Amino acid sequence: MANNDKQLMFTRNIGIMAHIDAGKTTTSERILFYTGLTHKIGETHDGTATMDWMAQEQERGITITSAATTTFWNYLGNRYKINLIDTPGHVDFTVEVERSLRVLDGAVATFCAVGGVEPQSETVWRQADKYNVPRIGYVNKMDRSGANYYEVVRQLKDVLGANPCPIQIPIGAEETFKGVVDLIKMKAIFWHDETMGAEYSVEEIPADLQAEAEEWRDKMLEALAECDDAIMEKYFDDPSTITEEEIMVAIRKGTLAMQINPMTCGSSFKNKGVQTLLDAVCAFLPSPEDTPAIEGTDPSDPDKIITRKPLFEEPLTALAFKIATDPYVGRLCFFRVYAGSINAGSYVLNTRSGKKERISRLFQMHSNKQNPMEVIGCGDIGAGVGFKDIRTGDTLCDENHPITLESMEFPEPVIGIAVEPKTQKDMDKLGMGLAKLAEEDPTFRVQTNEETGQTVISGMGELHLDIIIDRLRREFKVECNQGRPQVTYKEAITQPVELREVYKKQSGGRGKFADIIVRMEPADESFEGTLQFIDEVKGGNIPKEFIPSVQKGFEKAMKNGVLAGYPLDKLKVTLIDGSFHPVDSDQLSFEIAAIQAFKNASAKAGPVLMEPIMQMEVVTPEESMGDVIGDLNKRRGQVEGMETSRTGARIVKAKVPLAETFGYVTALRTITSGRATSSMQFSHYAQVSSSIAKQVLTEVQGRVDLIK
């Protein structure tokens, strides 16, 4: 076997994904400790975790950016290279999770043994389904009071619709948790506290656990029989003839096909269970060789599909999945190489910009420290320096064999705040700092209000913007004043309107002329984009070359609705007919006619204001539930359901307009004496009632007269 192929076979690109407090970063830290990359274990609760490298992360104890780390692990005599991506679990940062999942081959879904499947676990699980990422489950915090491995396994099945397949069961729970039973080898593993869990012993299963272990082994074999014919045959004839090797092959096969999720458990904080988790990563998660060939399109012919296999001899194909600013080396671009390889000092083609870029240096990252590399090969994750123009989602490839990979889609920001520098000298620094941060984060936008000159920054939630302001202060030394949060409203129309628009201009010499008849109406329910444009012009009444200009005019005009200049969403425009002048008509005339048609038709089409609605989940003690629901009702919330958690707390699910959620965390703390927690994420846009629309439009001096 060629050395390169061997290298691919022993590479794992994995992410650790979970709810905010399930212990992702702690687990990552233990992996770095046991694989020999760190000599002191970092703890998230004392702010020394290696993976949480931004100052705000260390203060807040949560992970914001996905730090990518390369480490090694010896398993069955082979040295495995593990590229580990630590992903955030807070809903304001789901975009970071999406980015990571796009470039991973497999994932470790971490669950808290006490909290089980929490709201964010569901979100992340759905994201991993979307990208077809095989996963193994790790039930962490087995040492905590209320830990229940079997209940978490049940929740995976019932809440997530997963097919959990325990390959370990715990020995003890809460303070008596001391090891696991390996159901494949039918042995007990005990970790030694005196070596901080670095050493463990493999022993016979304690007699009092033997029957339970056999029962769970049988359940494991039954799950494997469903996805492997060879096991099924032996399982029904004589299960005792199934060999350890056959079980390992079947688990790997079922995991890669996403038919099962092998389940392991441990307590990362107490240094138990991490080595067996690493073994499971090497044994069951895919190598780049196990992933299908990546598909892209030909930049010169977007209908032509190109595939690239994960081979070193294929032309270079890589995806930029994150841009970060490093204080020492400048702009760092993280990328995943799907085919071929990148050499330091070489040129690559960016198919979005159409430009060749020279990569001056290459690194592999250990959290935020760089290890210089000469080459980053197929199936690997690395970072490069030297890019002049690079964005998240760009394809980097060989200029002689261009390819464009599917770009990444990011949600639109839903909340904005106005910012201004405290002093005049901060003015330039503010602009530069915001531009750099917007480059790093595709869900963060910066706009300048042309009328007021105000700078408005927008993001995915209050925490997201807090952290941006914090980074401006720390990294760019800019102090700024901030306004109160503003909601990013949208506009929509409710009725169809048909209209003829003629644009004519005569000023001596060649004039301007365009004549269009359009029907404007709300887009079809199933339509995903912003503008659904249909051309029904017959007989060349409008020449083909002018039709894209009509579409372009509507696209431009939709950015500013007639009520208050908010963008329009989901519009259907049908170009029915029109006429042109052989001398005076040009592309610009048709574009202007479309812009005017939009403005005139919108005012007659029942324009309405749309507001972002958030999906909220509040976990509260029973005795505070009445107050919590009363408060949500006051905030125009719609309670959709209530559940009881394992610990007896009540879980309230509601849809609440974003405009009513500002300061909610503080209010919730007050009404429940700090005993409730909440999480929310964007759900959809919905029409605002006329009384509230008038209030909003009065604030922004919009067209209140158009609201019925």
From Swiss-Prot:
Lineage: Bacteria, Pseudomonadati, Bacteroidota, Bacteroidia, Bacteroidales
Pfam families associated with the record: EFG_C, EFG_III, EFG_IV, GTP_EFTU, GTP_EFTU_D2
Subcellular compartments: Cytoplasm
Keywords: Cytoplasm, Elongation factor, GTP-binding, Nucleotide-binding, Protein biosynthesis
Coiled-coil boundaries: none
Signal peptide: none
Family: Belongs to the TRAFAC class translation factor GTPase superfamily. Classic translation factor GTPase family. EF-G/EF-2 subfamily.
A GO term, aspect molecular function: GTPase activity
Protein's job: Catalyzes the GTP-dependent ribosomal translocation step during translation elongation. During this step, the ribosome changes from the pre-translocational (PRE) to the post-translocational (POST) state as the newly formed A-site-bound peptidyl-tRNA and P-site-bound deacylated tRNA move to the P and E sites, respectively. Catalyzes the coordinated movement of the two tRNA molecules, the mRNA and conformational changes in the ribosome.
Family annotation (CDD domains): EF-G, EFG_III, EFG_mtEFG1_IV, EFG_mtEFG_C, EFG_mtEFG_II
GO biological process: ribosome disassembly
NCBIfam families: EF-G, PRK12740.1-5, small_GTP
GO cellular component terms attached to this protein's record: cytoplasm
Domain tr-type G intervals: 9-289
Domain of life per record: Bacteria
Binding of GTP, residues: 18-25, 86-90, 140-143
Protein name: Elongation factor G
InterPro entries linked to this entry: EFG_II, EFG_III, EFG_III/V, EFG_IV, EFG_V, EFG_V-like, EFTu-like_2, G_TR_CS
